[in-house]
């Protein structure tokens, strides 16, 4: 299992030199952030990013993410040009030595949280989600949730939401299938492994359909194009926020098939009301048995890439919520410690 750390490029407040100092850290997960969604990522930009990462003594093999344009998800006629661009981006990433591409198929928003800095009993802060707060929002008046204000202008957001009123889960499945049948053969030819990320949280939000939320959804996606190039990013926190999901069992099933190409490992504390907050990685801090999840990866012989996912803000750190240095570093060494113990006692 190869440890990686997400880095948001030159604007990330965390220097690569600090990331390299985490014991066992070998890889960076990043992306090209200044290209408009739907346009081809230029090879020279990819190579420049790779050179920056390698100059710090780290490797760049996983991209997170190559965004999927809304026109593809909506099934608009413009999708064919956008899919062709996506195919070329896959080719360019392969030419630069990338092995895994993480992506998602969530309509409109990649993630949903109602708080970016919920204070915990120990004084740290975390990302959190309140079902009640989301249900009380009148989408016709706009959506003012953390992380969303700069995503869309009000009129643009309302127009996009209106377009999705005609898209139910069945149609979104059709559009995902069309997309996969177009890109997976290209990925396979290039030696790239595509890894779809689950919905976060794994439930419909604001009437928008969600189709990557549970075991049956994941199995259906893999069956659309049944090849190792069509795989999963298995995010324990995203899937684990749904009480219907047994993350350990998912790792054993899909990891045993060799279809998990990228692992996001984090803990969440969930409530009967469907609320959750992101905790420290330690099993006792949340609702997930992280030790059992890591053991499942070990038992199936997982040799892919993983990263400690979102962390709390601790020790006075400020920066991008969920993506501070300190707590993610603690998560990394916690996971690596368990992995080493399993290796030496196997």
Swiss-Prot record:
It holds the Pfam family UxuA. This is Mannonate dehydratase. GO terms for molecular function: ferrous iron binding; manganese ion binding; mannonate dehydratase activity. It comes from the Bacteria. It is an enzyme of class 4 (lyase). Catalyzes the dehydration of D-mannonate. The gene is uxuA. Keywords: Iron, Lyase, Manganese. Pathway: Carbohydrate metabolism; pentose and glucuronate interconversion. Its EC number is 4.2.1.8. One of its GO terms (biological process) is D-glucuronate catabolic process. SUPFAM superfamilies: Xylose isomerase-like. Belongs to the mannonate dehydratase family. It catalyses: D-mannonate = 2-dehydro-3-deoxy-D-gluconate + H2O. The keyword Iron applies. Its cofactor is Fe(2+); Mn(2+).
């Amino acid at each position: 299992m190869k440890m990686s750390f997400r880095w948001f490029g030159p604007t990330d407040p965390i220097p690569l030199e600090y990331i390299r100092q985490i014991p066992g850290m070998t890889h960076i997960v990043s992306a090209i952030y200044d290209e408009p969604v739907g346009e081809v990522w230029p090879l020279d930009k990819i190579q420049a990013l790779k050179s920056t990462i390698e100059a710090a003594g780290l490797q760049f093999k996983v991209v997170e993410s190559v965004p999927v344009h809304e026109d593809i998800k909506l099934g608009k006629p413009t999708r064919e040009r956008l899919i062709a661009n996506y195919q070329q981006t896959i080719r360019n990433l392969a030419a630069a030595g990338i092995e895994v591409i993480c992506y998602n198929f969530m309509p409109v928003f990649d993630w949903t949280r109602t708080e970016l800095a919920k204070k915990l009993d120990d004084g740290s802060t975390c990302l959190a989600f309140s079902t009640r707060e989301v249900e009380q929002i009148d989408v016709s008046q706009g959506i003012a949730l953390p992380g969303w204000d700069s995503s869309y202008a009000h009129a643009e957001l309302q127009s996009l939401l209106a377009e999705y009123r005609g898209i139910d889960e069945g149609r979104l499945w059709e559009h995902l299938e069309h997309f996969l049948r177009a890109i997976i053969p290209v990925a396979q030819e290039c030696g790239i492994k595509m890894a779809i990320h689950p919905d976060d949280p794994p439930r419909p939000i604001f009437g928008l359909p969600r189709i990557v939320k549970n075991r049956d959804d994941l199995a259906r996606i893999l069956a659309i194009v049944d090849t190792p190039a069509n795989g999963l990013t298995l995010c324990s926190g995203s899937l684990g926020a749904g009480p219907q999901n047994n993350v350990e069992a998912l790792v054993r099933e899909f990891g045993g098939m060799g279809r998990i190409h990228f692992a996001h490992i984090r803990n969440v504390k969930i409530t009967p009301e469907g609320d959750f907050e992101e905790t420290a990685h330690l099993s006792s801090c949340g609702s997930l048995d992280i030790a059992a999840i890591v053991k499942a990866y070990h038992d199936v012989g997982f040799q892919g890439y993983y990263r400690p996912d979102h962390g709390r803000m601790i020790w006075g750190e400020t920066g991008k919520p969920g993506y501070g240095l300190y707590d993610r570093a603690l998560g990394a060494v916690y996971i690596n410690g368990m992995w080493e113990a399993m290796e030496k006692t196997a």
